[in-house]
Amino acid sequence: MNNTEFSKIAETTIAYIADKIEEQDKEASIDVDLQGDILNLDTDKGIYVINKQSAAKEIWLSSPVSGPYHFFYEQGKWKNKIGLELMAILTEELNIKFDNI
């Protein structure tokens, strides 16, 4: 995947995460702040940071619950080196249903 393709997929994914949270968080318990390529989620568990790392062609997640992760894009999913999926981690920790996009 070239840099342009990576940027488009990563930016679409991060925007999708922000949109899904705002759509499903009926109590507005998660403060969503998307600034460029950086998504901050302020929750009662702490602050999540999701951002794109262009040089590595990865999305990075910093979770106050489970720690840091680096995800690469493979077969339509963002996975880390041991096979954990970005959307699965977010679904479990935030109680928001994400589909793979």
UniProtKB/Swiss-Prot annotation:
GO cellular component assignments: cytoplasm
One of the protein's GO biological processes: iron-sulfur cluster assembly
Keywords assigned by UniProt, alphabetized: Iron, Metal-binding
Molecular function, one GO term: ferric iron binding
Transmembrane segments: none
Top-level division of the source organism's lineage: Bacteria
Listed PANTHER family: FRATAXIN, FRATAXIN, MITOCHONDRIAL
Family statement drawn from the similarity comment of this UniProt entry: Belongs to the frataxin family.
Protein's job: Involved in iron-sulfur (Fe-S) cluster assembly. May act as a regulator of Fe-S biogenesis.
Protein name: Iron-sulfur cluster assembly protein CyaY
Source species of the chain: Rickettsia felis (strain ATCC VR-1525 / URRWXCal2) (Rickettsia azadi)
Gene expressing this chain: cyaY
